[in-house]
């Protein structure tokens, strides 16, 4: 019984730790949202929270906004059948 309880607790922890993350993307052209200030960034945080209401954070990584703690159905880069200006 204790083993079953421990396994259930571990699975619950793993599920909360492995939340979805990804680059915020423009639905129309498939491009990532660009940013210049790397690291913690108010612009990226604001955009992530505006697009994905339950997003816990966002920062600039590789000159694009990276959103953290997203819900599983969140749409992130790359979009299927969408290329950023043919790139």
Swiss-Prot record:
Query: What family does the Swiss-Prot or TrEMBL record give for this protein?
Result: Belongs to the long (4 C-C) scorpion toxin superfamily. Sodium channel inhibitor family. Beta subfamily.
Q: Which PROSITE patterns match?
A: LCN_CSAB (PS51863)
Which residue ranges does the record assign to the LCN-type CS-alpha/beta domain? 20-85
Say which species the protein is native to: Centruroides limpidus
Q: Does the keyword Signal apply?
A: yes
This protein is called Toxin Cll3
Where are residues bearing Tyrosine amide located in the sequence? 85
Tell what the record comments on domains: Has the structural arrangement of an alpha-helix connected to antiparallel beta-sheets by disulfide bonds (CS-alpha/beta).
